Amino acid sequence: MKIRVGILTSGGDCPGLNATIRGVAKALYHRMGDKVEIIGIMNGYDGLIHGNYRMMDPSEFSGILTVGGTILGTKRTPFKMMRVVGEDKIDKVAAMKKTYKEAKLDCLLCLGGNGTHKTANLLSQEGLNVIGLPKTIDNDIFGTDVTFGFHTAVDIATEVIDRIHTTAGSHSRVMCIEIMGNKAGWLTLYSGIAGGADIILIPEHPYDIEKVADAVERRAKAGKNFSILAVAEGALSVEEAKMKRKEWTAKRAESGYTTATNRIAKQVEAMTGAETRICVPGHMQRGGSPSAYDRVLATQFGAYAAGLVADVHYGVTVAMVSRNVTANPLIDIAGKTRNVPDDCAMLNVARSMGISLG
């Protein structure tokens, strides 16, 4: 009797998705041979909702280790909308369960971030056999020390900061680099340290613009003709941190500065007189070939997930804890975010180096 394994990639793409898919497939084929069939669910949960899936040939998993993006396609399907019946009159949860049954799946592997894991847990609670795999450049999935895609994004953001140094120095400017990360500052913290940023601003540590401006002025007085700010896109001021999201987004809109980076740059320029510019690498941080580290990590996660399938161990997500690959119950991690804690070792490293955290 053959086992039918469904695989989908959901949410934003990142380096390592294809490497993980490959790890799962190769490990399954090696372990089960022709007793396993892999069904590709196209474009994330949207494909599961609308019955968009296909049988995959073993040859499709060759040559994708180094390829960025995802061969299955992906789409954001917000968790908060899963129970909402829209204008199309589709009950999304019922539709996903129907596709699972029609495709004759024995289990479903969901590669994605926090939203993906919330939906994976929902499906698990609805009785489906589900396994999650942690993907995000934000590195903010609860219960795992690292997610695939993170290290490649750190490499990319670091290179951006590296390249900004020379132009900042040549023009005696303050350069604000906006790094991805709405709720967690891991990517900004790591790339900021790796790239030699002078000021690092992350969502978990609300900044005081006076301290930011003071850090720039202190560098100028010390003979430094430029400053580099690594700013998480989700950075909040001390004042904003006291408000509800709707309040501070409205205030930003009123001021004309919709992003934290834009406002910080204008404020620093006004307060210090230093010419200030913004650099937004944006989606470059989630594109391209995965780093060697992420290829290894993705392969580890994929092979471990294949083992879970073989052992009929469902309702969990793969994780790296203290350098060991393991599995956490979906119900224990869904809906939780792994933020940068106040006692984070890398925050202490930044402080010890004289890097301002605002």
Question: Which residues fall in each region the model found?
Answer:
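Accessory alpha-helical/coil subdomains and C-terminal extensions
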Residues: 99, 110-112, 120-122, 150-171, ...
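Flexible loop/turn connectors
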Residues: 298-310
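Short Gly/Thr/Asp-enriched flexible loops that form oxyanion-binding sites at enzyme active sites
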Residues: 20-24, 114-128, 188
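Short, ordered loop/turn segments at secondary-structure junctions
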Residues: 10-13, 41-46, 76-77, 113-116, ...
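A cross-family phosphate/adenosyl-ligand binding-site feature
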Residues: 1-9, 20-104, 115, 236-242, ...
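Short, glycine-rich nucleotide/cofactor-binding loops
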Residues: 8-18, 180
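Short, acidic/small-residue loops that bind anionic groups at enzyme active sites
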Residues: 32-33, 123-147, 151-154, 201-208
